[in-house]
Amino acid sequence: MPTWGARPASPDRFAVSAEAENKVREQQPHVERIFSVGVSVLPKDCPDNPHIWLQLEGPKENASRAKEYLKGLCSPELQDEIHYPPKLHCIFLGAQGFFLDCLAWSTSAHLVPRAPGSLMISGLTEAFVMAQSRVEELAERLSWDFTPGPSSGASQCTGVLRDFSALLQSPGDAHREALLQLPLAVQEELLSLVQEASSGQGPGALASWEGRSSALLGAQCQGVRAPPSDGRESLDTGSMGPGDCRGARGDTYAVEKEGGKQGGPREMDWGWKELPGEEAWEREVALRPQSVGGGARESAPLKGKALGKEEIALGGGGFCVHREPPGAHGSCHRAAQSRGASLLQRLHNGNASPPRVPSPPPAPEPPWHCGDRGDCGDRGDVGDRGDKQQGMARGRGPQWKRGARGGNLVTGTQRFKEALQDPFTLCLANVPGQPDLRHIVIDGSNVAMVHGLQHYFSSRGIAIAVQYFWDRGHRDITVFVPQWRFSKDAKVRESHFLQKLYSLSLLSLTPSRVMDGKRISSYDDRFMVKLAEETDGIIVSNDQFRDLAEESEKWMAIIRERLLPFTFVGNLFMVPDDPLGRNGPTLDEFLKKPARTQGSSKAQHPSRGFAEHGKQQQGREEEKGSGGIRKTRETERLRRQLLEVFWGQDHKVDFILQREPYCRDINQLSEALLSLNF
């Protein structure tokens, strides 16, 4: 029995309908290729049995995804044909189905491309919804304002273009040009999809694409920044000569492992795996480039210190790697979590288990620009600054020198992942709080997306906000989060914080359900405003709730007077000391419950002191008699007109409109704005 995946696990057996046996056998090679598992249809114990037993052999995660895929294939809970812009059709047909396989790995849904702009999705409910969401995300990114694919005469290309084009080096792909013309936002999402597959143990589809290894190796070589070619830090570079490092330009590589056992399935696992320390670690990988495009050869030797004790020799087309177990270089494993330029982690020719070649795994946004792919040997003019940067970061793992003409671009995704590397523990002290503090209502989705830089749903951000108010003495805290965020979602990070807050009754889930393959969610903003009304609480959100302000005067007052904005500086949660402006109450006053003095309306609403401060009483009685308080639509109209003149001064405009509820004269309001001192 062959060994599937990186680590063998006990077989997983489950039953499906016997009517689906033909489907299973038809899709068996497809499942084995994508999920890197062995699929077996066990013999029936009784011919009349309405079920058949399937057995999966492979790593636990692979088997779990394959099991969900097969269950959805045999008994689909949802099946529908979705539509998307025809421009994206090349994603599902191009690259020999590679991106389609990655999407199947990520969602465990059965995907069948049809006419341009049409995709049939079937599977379990969760898998169907995830696949539909990923396709909708790709369609949405088509309209993002990103620079399109490579253009003629461009002297530099971004890391996204470099990595993406490296995936498309397979000859004879009719959709290659269409893929390269996709917007950068779509290419970035596809690379993120590939990263999800690589962070697990798939897709095994790579092994069936013979031409893909050259492209991926080309991405790896281009991602490695060449050190100064003085021989001080290279690893046996004397035998390199003019070794070729041009996988991204069309060279193909034959990957061989010397001294390995014969037989075994073809496999290519992208995830970085730590092998047991007892194994023999002396391995060799011979990479022999076979030029198909011709041209001058280029060399890009790997940094010796970046690979630990790995000997790299590239001479006469050979590339040998001798390695030590990762236990000797624990920092390499930590560095493998950050995204580098390479998309290939392990290469293997189908004759034995593949050796592990450490190289930086992919990330949604590569941190480097890619300069002209000139001779790697000419890149030795990198200054001392690069050496210092490498030395400072060496403790975190292997660092790669960039080319002298390339830029060093730090991305938001990279910064977010770096912030997640800092440990954080939600620690709510079991001590009494202050009884005079208001109820805190947190907009969980808004807080999580702000901390996740609008790309990830960061559960840590919610936990940090709760920790902040808990430390201030608040004990009445409610976080609202849509219920579907608790299901499997690739955008959610560190969901264990949500579980803990839910167990402490600090988190409430707004209802959501799936009907006909579409997610139906309740409007969580209503829950927040309603709870703030009933508890006289404060809403923590950067949302303006403009759509709810018109529903009632009470809600308008809550949104105007009890909305607390916030921001994050890394993992530091910050709120303003003057939530209603410089002349308004302090944060401590803002968060305290109002003093309930009988007969004093001003005591019931102390925050109105800000609205009453500095009121101009001239003409107020005339305005009251002539028209009364402005309606909401009149206020919004006046606000738009004022912002056309006082652009960017939203806070001042809102203050004047709040202070002058009877005034409808745009000129008087403008004069009042000009007379403000803050």
UniProtKB/Swiss-Prot annotation:
SUPFAM superfamilies: Eukaryotic type KH-domain (KH-domain type I) (SSF54791). Keywords: Phosphoprotein. One of its GO terms (cellular component) is nucleus. InterPro entries: KH_dom_type_1_sf, KH_N4BP1_1st, KH_N4BP1_2nd, RNase_Zc3h12_NYN, UBA_N4BP1_C, ZC3H12/N4BP1_RNase_Reg. Residues 222-251, 347-407, 595-633 are annotated as: Disordered. Pfam families: KH_N4BP1_1st (PF23050), KH_N4BP1_2nd (PF23052), RNase_Zc3h12a (PF11977), UBA_N4BP1_C (PF23054). The keyword Phosphoprotein applies. The keyword Transmembrane does not apply. The modification Phosphoserine is found at residues 10, 359. Residues 355-367 have a biased composition (Pro residues). This is Protein KHNYN. It comes from Homo sapiens. The gene is KHNYN.
